[in-house]
Amino acid sequence: MRVNNGLTPQELEAYGISDVHDIVYNPSYDLLYQEELDPSLTGYERGVLTNLGAVAVDTGIFTGRSPKDKYIVRDDTTRDTFWWADKGKGKNDNKPLSPETWQHLKGLVTKQLSGKRLFVVDAFCGANPDTRLSVRFITEVAWQAHFVKNMFIRPSDEELAGFKPDFIVMNGAKCTNPQWKEQGLNSENFVAFNLTERMQLIGGTWYGGEMKKGMFSMMNYLLPLKGIASMHCSANVGEKGDVAVFFGLSGTGKTTLSTDPKRRLIGDDEHGWDDDGVFNFEGGCYAKTIKLSKEAEPEIYNAIRRDALLENVTVREDGTIDFDDGSKTENTRVSYPIYHIENIVKPVSKAGHATKVIFLTADAFGVLPPVSRLTADQTQYHFLSGFTAKLAGTERGITEPTPTFSACFGAAFLSLHPTQYAEVLVKRMQAAGAQAYLVNTGWNGTGKRISIKDTRAIIDAILNGSLDNAETFTLPMFNLAIPTELPGVDTKILDPRNTYASPEQWQEKAETLAKLFIDNFDKYTDTPAGAALVAAGPKL
């Protein structure tokens, strides 16, 4: 660690932060460990040491993102390009903010950070040097600095020496906005972005994921405008260099299924796809830990050691962790640097073009098959639909599975209209000759979740090509091509109708789900391209 690295309090004054008496610049993991466990710390700043060697922290009531508190400054930069919450048919979280309110929020955060001892972490978002963002994170909380050191790409000493930030993130978790009502905002908490100033402000929420997903939203704005796919997916590569990407919302299996001992991990959540291939945005993983076991997910379990950072888990007095306890939240998490997983792409998290594109869905209705092979039009239809069941706890206030449609399997992070992401993805897939599949990691007629063992065998069949050679039949209403048998998979579950006491039970639920799909897709029918895709969806 080089304290300050020549970064002076005067430089922070350019952002409006004054009277800083100490800057801890790009702290080492050892220093962060000492800082987090400092016995003089109180509240959510203080970490607890666990028996696995990782520090655990609490994020208070903010155990997930706060999408209702997300704002983007509407000005000449963004007015005509952003996908706004108050325009068009599609619902999203991109609420406009006036430049005046932005200045007020910025004043609150800079006042909070002024006169303090600050942690500054410079890191990259994006493994491709041509398109990466150089991001400077500023916080007064040691574990928040640890979180971004884990999650973003750590620069070399040479890269740090010439580091010039493209984007500034100021985390003022301890401050809130008392004037929120007069300003027409959702609450006293805020996560705000300004594309002209290239800055993110955080106030009121302690959730680390706001910094991670904030930069994802920015990459989702900048890259597609350059013709580069920006994707909420995990990715891995096989021995022959064959790349697979796994799209899916939180809790559908992206991290679990891409962390495969037979394949090298590119990354578990956020990727781009350009002329050279698929590349990670991040330098770490952010895995869910609820009900984590060493037997079911050994790679993730073994990644929880010194330098990993646990969030909202229950730590017993002896330092052991109760991974089954979801009393604080179902969205318990761990962040760790990607090299905590043994089988990764080195030295840079990128590989060639993807040939297999897998859409993960967790169907709470028990209607969709465990796997189906999609046509080109079905690929676009299901990508724009982004169906899953919201699983407990990744957003505040959601505890039971409820059906949701999230465009591009990541509507919360989209900055442009969903059709722009679909167009770029389709172009990349066509150029690479990629095939798409819909994989249901959710429930079936038994009321039980499809086992990880069966899902892994299905993924193996996709990746080794045996699914493409399998005989298929068509599931009515949804018109999906389903294999009649697959090695290592219980044949009985391949047709979801067989998991019900009677086919009529499936039919009834299927009609309900089909109607939800049709109603949701209506928002895309105002364009000729969208209207043409209706035929690829379910029919009643």
Curated annotation (Swiss-Prot):
<protein>
    <recommendedName>
        <fullName>Phosphoenolpyruvate carboxykinase (ATP)</fullName>
        <ecNumber>4.1.1.49</ecNumber>
    </recommendedName>
</protein>
<feature type="binding site">
    <location>
        <position position="455"/>
    </location>
    <ligand>
        <name>ATP</name>
    </ligand>
</feature>
<feature type="modified residue" description="N6-acetyllysine">
    <location>
        <position position="87"/>
    </location>
</feature>
<feature type="modified residue" description="N6-acetyllysine">
    <location>
        <position position="523"/>
    </location>
</feature>
<dbReference type="InterPro" id="IPR013035">
    <property type="entry name" value="PEP_carboxykinase_C"/>
</dbReference>
<feature type="binding site">
    <location>
        <position position="333"/>
    </location>
    <ligand>
        <name>substrate</name>
    </ligand>
</feature>
<feature type="binding site">
    <location>
        <position position="297"/>
    </location>
    <ligand>
        <name>ATP</name>
    </ligand>
</feature>
<feature type="binding site">
    <location>
        <position position="65"/>
    </location>
    <ligand>
        <name>substrate</name>
    </ligand>
</feature>
<keyword id="KW-0210">Decarboxylase</keyword>
<keyword id="KW-0479">Metal-binding</keyword>
<feature type="binding site">
    <location>
        <position position="207"/>
    </location>
    <ligand>
        <name>substrate</name>
    </ligand>
</feature>
<keyword id="KW-0464">Manganese</keyword>
<keyword id="KW-0067">ATP-binding</keyword>
<comment type="function">
    <text>Involved in the gluconeogenesis. Catalyzes the conversion of oxaloacetate (OAA) to phosphoenolpyruvate (PEP) through direct phosphoryl transfer between the nucleoside triphosphate and OAA.</text>
</comment>
<feature type="binding site">
    <location>
        <position position="232"/>
    </location>
    <ligand>
        <name>Mn(2+)</name>
    </ligand>
</feature>
<feature type="binding site">
    <location>
        <position position="213"/>
    </location>
    <ligand>
        <name>Mn(2+)</name>
    </ligand>
</feature>
<dbReference type="GO" id="GO:0004612">
    <property type="term" value="F:phosphoenolpyruvate carboxykinase (ATP) activity"/>
</dbReference>
<dbReference type="InterPro" id="IPR008210">
    <property type="entry name" value="PEP_carboxykinase_N"/>
</dbReference>
<comment type="pathway">
    <text>Carbohydrate biosynthesis; gluconeogenesis.</text>
</comment>
<keyword id="KW-0547">Nucleotide-binding</keyword>
<dbReference type="GO" id="GO:0005829">
    <property type="term" value="C:cytosol"/>
</dbReference>
<comment type="subunit">
    <text>Monomer.</text>
</comment>
<feature type="binding site">
    <location>
        <begin position="248"/>
        <end position="256"/>
    </location>
    <ligand>
        <name>ATP</name>
    </ligand>
</feature>
<feature type="binding site">
    <location>
        <position position="213"/>
    </location>
    <ligand>
        <name>substrate</name>
    </ligand>
</feature>
<feature type="binding site">
    <location>
        <begin position="449"/>
        <end position="450"/>
    </location>
    <ligand>
        <name>ATP</name>
    </ligand>
</feature>
<feature type="binding site">
    <location>
        <position position="269"/>
    </location>
    <ligand>
        <name>Mn(2+)</name>
    </ligand>
</feature>
<feature type="binding site">
    <location>
        <position position="333"/>
    </location>
    <ligand>
        <name>ATP</name>
    </ligand>
</feature>
<keyword id="KW-0963">Cytoplasm</keyword>
<dbReference type="GO" id="GO:0006094">
    <property type="term" value="P:gluconeogenesis"/>
</dbReference>
<dbReference type="InterPro" id="IPR015994">
    <property type="entry name" value="PEPCK_ATP_CS"/>
</dbReference>
<dbReference type="InterPro" id="IPR001272">
    <property type="entry name" value="PEP_carboxykinase_ATP"/>
</dbReference>
<keyword id="KW-0312">Gluconeogenesis</keyword>
<keyword id="KW-0007">Acetylation</keyword>
<dbReference type="GO" id="GO:0046872">
    <property type="term" value="F:metal ion binding"/>
</dbReference>
<keyword id="KW-0456">Lyase</keyword>
<dbReference type="Pfam" id="PF01293">
    <property type="entry name" value="PEPCK_ATP"/>
</dbReference>
<feature type="binding site">
    <location>
        <position position="232"/>
    </location>
    <ligand>
        <name>ATP</name>
    </ligand>
</feature>
<comment type="similarity">
    <text>Belongs to the phosphoenolpyruvate carboxykinase (ATP) family.</text>
</comment>
<dbReference type="GO" id="GO:0005524">
    <property type="term" value="F:ATP binding"/>
</dbReference>
<feature type="binding site">
    <location>
        <position position="213"/>
    </location>
    <ligand>
        <name>ATP</name>
    </ligand>
</feature>
